[in-house]
Amino acid sequence: MARYVFITGGVVSSLGKGIAAAALAALLQARGYRVRLRKLDPYLNVDPGTMSPYQHGEVFVTDDGAETDLDLGHYERFTGRSANSQDNITTGRIYRNIIERERRGDYLGATVQVIPHVTDEIKRFITTGNEEFDFVLCEIGGTVGDIEAMPFLEAIRQLGNELSRQNVIYIHLTLMPFIPSAGELKTKPTQHSVKELQSVGISPDILLVRADRSIPETERCKLSLFCNVRANAVIQALDMPTIYDVPMAYHKEGLDSEVLCAFGIDSAPPPQMDLWEDITHRIHHPEGEVTIAVVGKYTGLKDAYKSLIEAIAHGGLANKVKVNIEWIDSQLFEKENSVLALQKAHGILVPGAFGARGAEGKIRAIQFARERKIPFLGICFGMQLACIEAARNIAQIENASSSEFCETENPIVGLMTEWLKGDVLEKRTRNGDLGGSMRLGAFAAELKEESHIAKIYGMTKIVERHRHRYEVNIDYKDKLEQCGLIFSGMSPDGVLPETIEYVDHPWFIGVQYHPELKSRPFDPHPLFSSFIEAAVEQSRLV
């Protein structure tokens, strides 16, 4: 039977529950245990697919096409295990399931209430499909005290009784702020947070306390006394230079040992930390550095590009270099001198996005990369704009644009109306719902033999994750290829362009999919490894 670890947060949001859960999972995995991570989000949206990146940050897409919380990206990167649609749930999805059951008559005329019906649905989600795992780590989104989180806290309280306390533990992540005027760390916010948690019937077994400096033993003992937690189970979680330092730091503080102790496990094998030691060594002892310019639309919130940032760093790890990211707002880029902003870059990357705002700035950056022979990687929207740039500036196609922006006589990029998902034909209309209506999840692509991208992958058949509603118009393929822009990858049915490249450019690749979603620190995605390698070569030329 799986053992359950519930991770809650208090005092303030954005403390890093997702990183804490992922780091603990990595430590348990390093001891040989099979671990599953799940995220429970209290918001009423069915999923984050239609939420603004400024509101939610990145939408992380799984192989089976689920649009999920960005924390699932951390889960995958730290454990190497691919998440799926059953690893993330929201209040909106819970209520939708319940209302569908009520309409079918499944409740046999009963009055549908938060307790037991909502809490039972939450418990069903938590406990289903865990037979092959030793530990299931569940992160509860939000902060203790939020009204939206109450049904989730009640559900995990009930599970503590139903599964027995030998199979359930609670970890509470809090903040211990330093007050400069007093010159000391304060325990009171954590005390009140634990009191709030205890008021709903949950007493934490372990306190994971965030702080920007070492916590004195006297303060740890104070937290132990007032929060009713063993002194050894008050674990300091100090700020780290990078998120990949966290597993080693938590192991040093004894988090994994305390978790096993709380479950009464005293015969666990020691963790094999060689992998993490190698990663942290590469991070802190680079043999050089390069600068990558990311020309994006949501640069005001870096969480909108969380997986991209990590994948770029992974490319640096593969090449033993530090990668500095130069963020360029594509909208401002339209008004300013593009040459000055990009002159110091050893590589240029245009990531995914939606809408016309900032698109012209990205097109200017793509033109700069093409003409100056600077390594370029265009992802999703970035590939589409690379095709528009080629159509305008090389093929001289008048009014070349995307139907996403405006009505145009030459739609180089257009709305997809149908595509194959396995053996099933999926269809969409322009006026349909936005939520869940894109080409989502893992799709196969076939690469041309001897193409640059096929050499990077070392194969001609690949499977990558997608999230897009628009696609490069296949009707313009011949015209663009005559100008040197090769469609080096296509969907298996030959209808949807998947990758492009220039034959006369040292490194210029566009992909319709999102390779950043499958990159891991210990297994960098080949595209990012090759892109950073090309940037290293470029740095030697300037």
From Swiss-Prot:
Region annotated Amidoligase domain, chain positions: 1-265
SUPFAM superfamilies found in the cross-reference section: Class I glutamine amidotransferase-like, P-loop containing nucleoside triphosphate hydrolases
Amino-acid positions noted as binding UTP in the UniProt annotation, renumbered to this chain: S13, K186, T187, K188, P189, T190, Q191, K222
UniProt: L-glutamine binding residues: Y54, A353, F381, G382, M383, Q384, E404, R469
Enzyme class of the recorded protein, top EC level: ligase
Protein residues bound to ATP: S14, L15, G16, K17, G18, I19, D71
Catalysed reactions listed for this entry: UTP + L-glutamine + ATP + H2O = CTP + L-glutamate + ADP + phosphate + 2 H(+); L-glutamine + H2O = L-glutamate + NH4(+); UTP + NH4(+) + ATP = CTP + ADP + phosphate + 2 H(+)
Chain positions recorded as CTP binding sites: S13, D146, I147, E148, K186, T187, K188, P189, T190, Q191, K222
Pathways involved: Pyrimidine metabolism; CTP biosynthesis via de novo pathway; CTP from UDP: step 2/2
Gene Ontology annotations for the cellular component aspect, listed alphabetically: cytosol
NCBIfam families per the UniProt record, alphabetical: PRK05380.1, PyrG
Role, per record: Catalyzes the ATP-dependent amination of UTP to CTP with either L-glutamine or ammonia as the source of nitrogen. Regulates intracellular CTP levels through interactions with the four ribonucleotide triphosphates.
Descriptive protein name: CTP synthase
Organism: Bartonella tribocorum (strain CIP 105476 / IBS 506)
